[in-house]
C-alpha cells in the first residue's frame, strides 16, 4: 500500500505516519527526516535546507524530488510506504506520479488531515527542544519537570526559529497557496480522503483505518 499524508504543519501527520507504519508494516518516509540528515552531514543540500527553514519557508522542488527519488530506490519500499511531508505542490505530485509509473506503481490513497489554524499555531509555537540531547517538550501538553530546562541534562530549552508564531503563520500561508491545490488534484483523481485531525492519536488512527477499510 502506498499512502500520502497531507495537512498543514502541526497537523499530526508524523504521529499518524508512525502509527500506520507499525500497523501496516511499511516504512514511514518523512522528508523532514531526510532534510535533517542532510543538514547533520553538512551537505550542500543540507546548507540550502537550513537557510530556507530558518526563514520559515518551504524547500524547493528540485531539492526535495532528488531526495525522494533516492529514497524510493531502496528495497525496503517494495511492500509499500507512507509519504509524510511530500508532495507539497502539484508540481511535486506530478513528478511523483511519473516516478511511480516508471517503477510500475501508483498511490492507493491521499489522506488530508484537517486541523484549525489557531490549533496548529498553538501546537507548534509551544514546542521547546534541548540543544544538547534533542529531547522535545511542549509548554502545555508535555512540559519538563522544571520549566525551561531539559529533564535529562538540565540544559536550557530553546524554541526553534521556525516554531515561532509569526513563522508558523507564514508557513500556514505558504501551505494554503502551494499545498491546498493538492487536495483538488487528488480529489479530481478520486484518491483523496479528508480525516479530522483533532483528537487523540489513537482516535485519529481509528478514523484513518476506517477510511482505508482496515
UniProtKB/Swiss-Prot annotation:
Family the UniProt entry places it in: Belongs to the adenylate kinase family.
Phylogenetic lineage: Bacteria, Pseudomonadati, Myxococcota, Myxococcia, Myxococcales
Reactions mediated catalytically: AMP + ATP = 2 ADP
Quaternary assembly: Monomer.
Gene Ontology molecular functions: adenylate kinase activity; ATP binding; zinc ion binding
Signal sequence residues: none
Entry-linked HAMAP family: Adenylate_kinase_Adk
Comment text on domains: Consists of three domains, a large central CORE domain and two small peripheral domains, NMPbind and LID, which undergo movements during catalysis. The LID domain closes over the site of phosphoryl transfer upon ATP binding. Assembling and dissambling the active center during each catalytic cycle provides an effective means to prevent ATP hydrolysis. Some bacteria have evolved a zinc-coordinating structure that stabilizes the LID domain.
Binding site for ATP: 10-15, 127, 136-137, 199
One GO biological process term: AMP salvage
Protein name: Adenylate kinase
Record EC number: 2.7.4.3
Enzyme class per UniProt: transferase
Functional note: Catalyzes the reversible transfer of the terminal phosphate group between ATP and AMP. Plays an important role in cellular energy homeostasis and in adenine nucleotide metabolism.
Keyword Amino-acid biosynthesis: no
Keywords for the protein's UniProt record, in alphabetical order: ATP-binding, Cytoplasm, Kinase, Metal-binding, Nucleotide biosynthesis, Nucleotide-binding, Transferase, Zinc
Keyword Cell inner membrane: no
Sequence positions that bind AMP: 31, 36, 57-59, 85-88, 92, 160, 171
LID: annotated span: 126-163
PROSITE patterns: ADENYLATE_KINASE (PS00113)
Main location: cytoplasm
